[in-house]
């Protein structure tokens, strides 16, 4: 059980490669205005690391809880920048959306959080589906079987919980409803690659999607807050475009009160796109915003 409000802190709002792109910065004749803008203070919201968020709330036992959604390649840098600013310290659980590098390749860096209390090492609960578990075990075998560790032997400790796509699960008193979505397809077979979003409290989180089945839309409908994928202006085989994200948000009945688009590549200027979506505000249109790293919202 929880008491008081729940906050969502965006630790990252970019795609897998992040923004800026280093080759854009080192180009002898640079032309990428978005990447170049990150070198100046006024372009700070164009710095976008792998999409990730922290669900922060006060438990009824009087201790704050932090549930991390995804832990990608840039998690360490996100934590270094945002943890102190938002008075975060521990990680009580990790929920993983899918088996791509930008969702779980930062897990090795969680060893430090397992050893915050050196007298009482902590095993972080991890919630993921079976396909993601299988891929993780191949990528990081020592995270699943500590006997496979090498070097000095300092490794993170995790306790794994397998999610079923059609069943709710509870993390630290918060009920999560899985939201299965298509995130591109397998190149070898053409079958859809599945990613999970999650509905909890009055928020639905869908960070990686190319299409959303009607059965999943039924679970999203009624959310007051929607976090939705939107890679760039043009269509893409594994992500919603910004226009598709807006269209999907407006297709919901009832519409969410607020929507935040995430997952941007380096062709998207935060300030330009945010001005565009703000211009859509009306009584019949949800407030859609371009999310940015470090942003904190109440849900």
Ranges and model annotations:
Residues 1-206, 272-299:
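Binuclear metal-dependent hydrolase catalytic cores
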Residues 210-298:
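Cap/insert and terminal regions of metallo-dependent hydrolase folds
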């Amino acid at each position: 059980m929880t008491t008081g409000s729940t906050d969502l802190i965006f630790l990252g709002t970019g795609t897998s490669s992040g923004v800026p792109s280093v080759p854009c910065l080192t180009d002898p004749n640079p032309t990428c205005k978005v990447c170049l803008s990150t070198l100046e203070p006024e372009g700070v919201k164009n710095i976008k690391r792998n999409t990730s968020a922290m669900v922060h709330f006060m438990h009824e036992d009087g201790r704050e809880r932090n549930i991390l959604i995804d832990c990608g390649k840039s998690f360490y840098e996100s934590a270094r920048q945002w943890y102190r600013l938002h008075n975060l310290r521990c990680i009580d659980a990790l929920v993983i959306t899918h088996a791509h590098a930008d969702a779980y390749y930062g897990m090795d860096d969680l060893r430090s959080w397992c050893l915050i209390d050196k007298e009482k090492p902590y095993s972080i609960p991890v919630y993921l589906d079976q396909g993601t578990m299988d891929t993780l075990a191949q990528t990081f075998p020592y995270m699943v079987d500590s006997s496979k560790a090498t070097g000095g032997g300092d490794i993170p400790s995790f306790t794994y919980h397998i999610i079923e796509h059609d069943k709710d699960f509870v993390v630290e008193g918060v009920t999560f409803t899985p939201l299965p979505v298509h995130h591109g397809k397998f190149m070898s077979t053409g079958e859809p690659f599945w990613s999970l979003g999650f509905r909890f409290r009055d928020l639905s989180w869908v960070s990686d999607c190319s299409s959303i089945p009607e059965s999943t839309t039924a679970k999203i409908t009624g959310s007051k807050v929607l976090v939705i994928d939107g890679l760039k202006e043009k269509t893409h085989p594994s992500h919603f475009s910004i226009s598709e994200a807006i269209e999907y948000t407006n297709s919901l009945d009832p519409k969410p009160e607020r929507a935040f688009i995430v997952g941007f590549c380096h062709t998207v200027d935060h300030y330009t796109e945010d001005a565009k979506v703000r211009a859509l505000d009306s009584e019949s249109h949800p407030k859609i915003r371009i999310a940015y790293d470090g942003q904190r919202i109440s849900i």
